[in-house]
Amino acid sequence: MLKALELAGFKSFADRTRFDFPDGITVVVGPNGSGKSNIVDAMKWVLGSQSAKSLRGKDMSDVIFKGSQTRGPAGAAEATIIFDNTGGQMPVDAPEVHVTRRVYRSGEGEYLINQQAVRLKDVKALIRGTGIGIDAYSLIEQGKVDRMLQANAKDRRAIFEEAAGISRFKAKKVEAERRLERVQTNLTRLGDIVDEVATRLKTLKSQAGKAERYRQASDRLKELRTVVAWNDWLTLSTELNEATTQLEAAQRQHRKADTLRESLEEQRQAAEMQLQTIADAAREAEQSRSELSGEIARIGGRRESDQTTLVEQRRTLIGHYRRLRAMRTEAGSAIADLRKTIAALEVAEAELADVQQKKESIAAKRDVEQATVHRIESARDDLQRDHLAAVRRVAEHEANRGRVAQQMREAARALEEIARNSVTAEEGLKTALRDHDEVARNVSELEKRITDAQREVEIADAKVCETRRVLERRREEIGSLKIRLQGITERARVLDELQQKQEGVSGGVREVLRMSNAELKKDLVGIVADCFSVDRQVAPLIDAALGPRSQYVIVRGGSVSDAISRGDIKIGTRVGIIRLDELPNRRPGDKIRLDGLAGVIGRADKMIDCEVELEPLVRHLLGNTWLVDTLATAIGLRKLSSAGLRFVTASGDLLDNDGSSVVGPPGGETGLVSRRSELAAAKSEMQHYSYQIAEAEKEVGRLTGVVDSEAAELGRHEQAMRKWITEHAAAEAKLHHVTERLSARQATVDELKRSSASHTELLATAKQQDGELAVSIQKGKQEIETLEAQRTEVDVQLTAASEQLREVQSEAMSISVEAARSEQRVESLTIAADVARRDQSQREAANQEVRDAMTRTRERITEIETRILEADNRLAELMIAMESADAKLQVLAAEANQEREATRRVQTESQAAIKAVAKATEAVATISSARDAAALKQSTLADRIAEDYQIDLRNDEPPEELAEIEDRSSVDEEISRLRGQVQNVGSVNMEALEELNELQVRYDELHGQYQDLTAAKDSLQRVIARINADSRRLFLDTLEAIRINFQKLYRKSFGGGHADLILEESDDPLEAGVEIVATPPGKPSFSNSLLSGGEKALTAVALLMSIFQYRPSPFCVLDEVDAPFDEANIGRFVTVLTEFLDQSKFIVVTHSKKTMTAATTLYGVTMQESGVSKQVSIRFEDVSEDGQINAA
C-alpha cells in the first residue's frame, strides 16, 4: 500500500528527494547525524504529528531546512506519502493517494490529499482503522520499543484498539456523545419552555373570562367619572382664580427677606468651605501620622522577632561549644587507650617471637634425646629379647601413663589460663553492657525529643493551615463584596444616567429646566422630586402621596409663569408650578396628631429631609398626608379624624381627602422620589461596601503577615526536628556498633565457658586412665623383677635416658602452651586496636559536624545583628517624621478653631434672617393655602382623569350637553360599586383572547419538537450502546488472537520462555488496561523494567509481529529497533521480519550489516555537503560494521 515518500526542504533534505518502497524489506543506512531518522520524522509529520518535541525540535518551524554554509534557508517544508490504492483500500477514487503536508516559515501550514486542501481531521479519517498512524503499530521509532513495554496499561491499549479497528468506532462514539449532549441540552431547554408555555396557556384561559367582565364594568365607570370630573373641574377653577390674586402681594414681601438670607448663606458657605479645606489638610496629616505609626509598629515587631531569634541562635552556639568540649575530652581518653593497646601489642608480638625460637630449640634437643634412648633399647634387645619384650610392655604402660600425666598437666594449665581469660572477658562484657545501656538511653532520649519536636511541628502546621483557611475565607469575602459592589455600582450608574437624562420627567418640565435665561434661572429652584431626601423604604409611599406633583417646578416668584404665558419659554406639554412666595401658612389638618395610633407609620412631611427654605413647601404638600400600614387602617382613621387628611398605605394605596382613592399594584416604573432615594442609598451602600473591602483587605494583609510568621515558626520547629533526627541517626549508628562489640564480647565469654567444660572433662578422663595404667605397670614390674637383675645396668641406662627424654618432652610441651597463649594475646590486642581506631575515626567525623554547625550559627547571628541595627536606624527616622506630623496637626487645629468662630457669627446673623423669611413665608402660606388646595384638587383631578381615560380637562372644552348631577351620593355609590367590581376582578389581560389562540398554536408546535428531540435522544443512546457492544466484542476477540500469536512468537524468538497479555480487571473492558508479562527462558518472573535492552526490544518486536499477524498494516517503519540486539538476536529479528513479507512491507533504519543482508532494497543517506542530507546508491560491501558508508 505504501509506495513512496517525497521530501522537499524538510529538515536536512534541502533538495527534493524521493524514496520508493517496493515489496520486501527496504533498509536505510548511513552514519550518525546523516539524517536517516528524518525519513521517519517526515512520515510522522505527514500523518498529523502536532508535537515539535516528538519531531526532535522546539517548534514546528524547525522542520524547515535552516540552510548551510553554501545554501540559504528554505521558505517552506513539504513531505508527501504516496499510497497505492489500486485495490480501493482507501475511500478515494484514484489509483494513487498523495497525502501532503506543507508548512511555511510564516507559520502557516496546510494538508492536501491529491493536491486538494483538506483538514487534519480528513487525513486522520483517511487512515483510521488501517493500522497507520503516529501512535499506531506501523511506526516504531527509537525509544518507542522500551516505552511500549514500560507504558502504563491504559496507554498501551491504544495499540490494540488500532489493531482491533475500533478507533473509528471510538470517533463515531465521541461524535454521537457530543450530539447526545447537545440533544439533552436542547431537550432540557425546550422542556422548560414547554412547561412555561403550558403554564401561560392555562393562565390565559382564566384571564379570558375576566377580560369580558372587566370591559363592561370599566366602560360604565368611565362614563360616570367623566361627568363627575367636569362638574368638579368647573367649581375648582372659580376658587383658584380668587386665591391667586390674594397671593401675589404676600409673595413680594417674602422675596425681600429671602434676598438678605441668601447673602448671609453665601458667607456661611464660604466659611464652611475654608473649614473643610483645613479639615482635609488635617486628615492628610493624620493619615501620614497613622502610616508612620504603622511602619514603626511593623519594624519594631520585626526587630523584636529578630532579637528573639538572636538569643536562640546564641544559645544554640553555646550548646555546640559544650558538645565540642565534651567530644574533645572523650577523644583524648580514647587516643590514650589506643596508644596503650598498641604498646601492649608490640610487647606481645616480641614475646611471641622469643617463645617461637625456644620452641624450635627444644624440638631439636628432644630429637637428640630420643635417638639416645633408641640406641640403648636396641643394645638391650640384642642381649635378651624376652626381657626386652617385658620391659617394652612396662615401658609402654609407663609411656602411656606419662602421656596421660602430661595431658593432665596440660588440661590443668589450660583451665588456669581459661580462668584468667574468663575474668578479663567478663570485665570486658560488663564494660560493653554499660556502654550499650548508656547509648540506648541516649537513643531513647533522642526519640522522645523527636516525638516532642514532631508534636510541635504538627501544632505549628495546624496553626498555619487554620490561618491560611481564614485568609482564604477573607479573600473569598472580598471577592463576594466586590461582586456586590460591582452590582450596586452598575445600578447606581443606571439610576444616575436616568437622573441626568431626566427620565420620567415630562417634556415641558425638561424644557423649563433647560431654559437659558439667567434672570429667570434665579427664580428657578428645581422640581419637587429633586429637592427632597427620603429613606428608600419610604420613597415609594412619598411618590404615591405626591403623584404628579413630584414633577412640579418650584420657583421663587411669578417670572417663570409669566415667561411661559408670554411664550418666552416654549413648552410642548403642560407644566405644574409651585411658587414658594405664595405658599399658605397652614393647611387643614396640619395640627392633627395621629402619632402613636395603631397602624400609623408617621406624617409624610416628617419623613423628608430638605433645605430650610423648602420646609414650608414640604408641609404644604405633605403636611396633611399620613403613612399607615393598610387601607383598612386609613379608612378607619379618616372616619375618626376631621376632613382634609390624606392617607398612603405601606403597599402604595392612596386615600385622598376628597374621598377618592387610588389602589392596586404600582406601575413598573420607579417614581422620581424613589429613584433619587434609591440612587442616594446605592451611593451609601457603595461607600459601605468600599469600606468593608478596605477593612477586609487590611485583615488579609494582617493574616498574610501572621501566615508568614507562623510559617517561620513552623520552619524553626522543623529545623529542630531535623537536628534531633540527625543526632538520633548518629546515636543509632553508635548503638549498632556498641551492640556488635557487646555480641563479640559475649561470644568470647561463651567460648571460654565451652572450652573450660571441655578441658574439665578431659582432665577427669585422664585421671581415670592414669589409675588404670598404674595397675598395669605394677603387674609388669612384678613380671620383670626376675629379669631386672640380669639387665640392671642396661635398665639403669635406659631409665636414665628415658627420664631425660621425658623432661625434654615436658619442657617442649610447656613452651608450646606458652606459644599458644602468646598468639592468642597478640590476636586479642590486634582486634582491640582495630576497634579503637574505628571509634576514633567516628569521633573525628562527629567533631567536624559540630564545628560546621557552629560556623553556620555564627553566620546566622551576624546576619540577625545586622538586621537589628538597620531596624534601629529606621525607627529613629520614623520617630522624627512622626513628631513633625504632630506639630503640623496642632497648627491646623488652631486654624480650624478660628474658622469655626467666624462661622458661628455668620450663622447667628443668618438665623435672624431665616426667621424673617419664615415669617414672610408663613404669611404667603396662609394666603396660598386655599389656592393650593384648589389647585391641587384641580390638578389631581385632571391628572387622574388624564391618566385613567386620556381626557384633558385643562385644555378640552366641557361637553355642550353636560349633565347636571342631581343626586351626587347615589352617583358616588355607583362609582364605588363599579370600582369594587373592577378591583375584585383583579389584574386583567385585555389581550388574553387574541394571545390565547397564538399561544395554543405555539404550544402545539413546541410539544411536537419536544417529542422529536426525545426520539432523537433514544436513537442516539441506542447507537452508542451498539457501538460499545461492537467495540467490546472486537477488542476482546482481537486481544485474545494477538495474545495467542504473542505467546507463540515469543517462544519462537527466545527459543523458549513464557509471555502473556493480561487484561486488567474492570467493569468495562473498553476502559481496562493491558499488561504485558514476559519471562525469558531460564529466568524467574520479574518486572519488564528489569529486562535487558535486547530482551525488551525482542519482546516488543514479538508483540508487534503478533499484531501484524492478526491485522497486517500496509507497511511498518522500524527506526534502529535492532540497536540493542546482539548477533544472535539480530538473526532472530530478521527471521521474524521475513516471515511477514507476504503480508506487509518493512522500512528499517539500521547500522547492522546483518540486518542489511535481509534487504531487498538498500538506500544510503549521507551528508556529502555539510548540513544537507542526500540519497545515495550503495552496495552491501560499501557499508562498514558501524554503518559508515565507504566512498567508492
Swiss-Prot record:
Subcellular location(s) of the protein: Cytoplasm
Signal peptide positions on this chain: none
Record keywords, A-Z: ATP-binding, Coiled coil, Cytoplasm, DNA-binding, Nucleotide-binding
Coiled coil start-end: 164-197, 234-292, 333-369, 396-464, 676-736, 772-902, 986-1030
UniProt key word RNA-binding: no
Residues the entry annotates as binding ATP: P31, N32, G33, S34, G35, K36, S37, N38
GO biological process: chromosome condensation; chromosome segregation; DNA replication; signal transduction; sister chromatid cohesion
Domain observations: Contains large globular domains required for ATP hydrolysis at each terminus and a third globular domain forming a flexible SMC hinge near the middle of the molecule. These domains are separated by coiled-coil structures.
Family: Belongs to the SMC family.
The protein's role, per its UniProt record: Required for chromosome condensation and partitioning.
Assembly behavior: Homodimer.
Name of the protein in question: Chromosome partition protein Smc
Gene from which the chain derives: smc
